[in-house]
Amino acid sequence: DDAAVDQAIRDNDLVSKFTCLDNPSADQVASWLDEGLVVARFSKRMEFGQRALGNRSILADPRRWESVERINSKIKYRDFWMPFTPSMMKEEADRLIENPKGLYSPFMTLAFDLKQEFRLAIPAAQHPSDKTVRPQMLKREDNPGYYDIIAAFRERTGLGVVLNTSFNLHGEPIVESPEDAISTFLRSDIDVLLFDHVAISRSNPSS
């Protein structure tokens, strides 16, 4: 909860070391992604499994191939060929991917071909060899806070999709507690650590 987050922030003296922004809006988060910043989102209950679905996720701009290079080399410390996956608004799916059967894929379990016209648009969130994506299709009622970030990103960029990878370092489990999130933030090159009611930034984030 927020109290546990606040305590972890105090315990790690983050206020004196970084910029803290209270109650960041979805549009502010979208603006950081649009600027090329890498944002780690920690929200509510833990997630576990093979995929992160927005509440323990590292987010980046899918339009920038440098997002892949930076996350691999300075955050996830993993092999260059391992692809990242996108989270997209459900209503964007038909526009972005080939899905003739209208399949709904909320858990990143199905692979789809990107439509030809979008292969150059989101290079960071597709398989570099076969140009497929394994998307999380997101309805607002499933995760309003996360959905609103993606919707705000669409307002800015015309694309209702973000790069989403699990919030952890390579070889470690997905972060569970605020302390885990802060530890991973401090040991990596993540730009912004986003909790529900506060954001911790390595620099002075624009609004």
Regions found by a protein language model. Give the residues of each.
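Flexible beta->alpha loop and helix N-cap segments adjacent to enzyme active/binding sites
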Residues: 1-207
